[in-house]
């Protein structure tokens, strides 16, 4: 409850701030209504379940999250993975996956993994986000044009099926869809209409047209899903199955990762707009609790929503009160106007999702960044992008993270320098029968081949080899085992090994692993100058004798 507590300490829950937060919460609630319904339908569930998700999740995240201006609810980022779960396991499976994802998010927050999410490479995030946008866009063609549901299990099969059926589009449905899309695009460009929540107005206009003219054959919320019940979310237990739960662990992990990424990105955007500072770990705790509790009230996966959070800030929201009011607004609309939703054309909701898909994909930004990005980043983007489209999001995220990690390890290994020092002032301070090797960078598994190859090139028989670790910031278990092996090999050849310059962390690792004992007394020396002086003294004594 960091956000709520900080807002209280800052006086933002006082009466002086009530008006701003109440107004912001009402406006965000109006904006969230069509989005929540659209995301639910795209996920393959009933529209009211999207509203339930927004109501329950937003209250929990407002109270227990780490950002005092965050607005939570269903988002477009989840559509690709959640629709697949719904198609395969049904709504009960979707609820179980949400619950599992919530538990994972909760533990991520409790074990302070919030800071680690930012280590996921940006090309991976951009790639799967753009891919999700394309999947959403194509997935709404049937509703937008009045086409039969696309056949085929995979994206390319569905795309081919939709392209073949385009000549059979339903004229009235397509006209309503195009009208809705045009209104969405034009409203922000008209000064008088710019501040109005365009998705809500599009929904109202399209619904009024359908109510007045009753276009034959136009699919509506009522014809597809029946009447939306005029009831608030109530407690109910999802149907649990042990076998199904095991199958849902991997998809749930993907949901958790997506939720963590989007909620923390939203919190960062909010900090930039509002001048606040969020707690990443507490935000994950709040998101985890929201996803654990929401399935028990008829909802599904939720996360911080960037667009709704930004709207909250622009309208003057500065405390968690706005998030609570947003939930109350949705609840009141549900109680007062649920029957009116029956005439909402699905084509209008599809138009809203077209805009969501475009905003998620950010084509202009992607092109601009990819033009300047290194080749490896471009390749990583397209790997994740095409896997998201052609395989699925689970595969895309996992392979994207693995490939980016391997690339990073390769780059780090290249950056590690292992060299024989012969012509520097420090090398000149050593006796002639002493060789010095310098390691610069993390002493980890990726650099061990370079280390062993460099030291294997010792084709003389020096009396002593000095390993200078002054610039080694970290040593892992592979580095320790390799160092142990190399030291043992040199000692078998009668070559003394001295290690110098290790920092406290590296020294502690060497001591725990027994490397310092293996070196022998007096062969681990903190300062290089002390080692050089000792070797010169020993050489002088040997020469004198």
Predicted regions and their residues:
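Transmembrane helical cores of multi-pass ion-transport proteins
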Residues: 1-419, 482
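Structured cytosolic domains appended to multi-pass membrane proteins
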Residues: 420-545
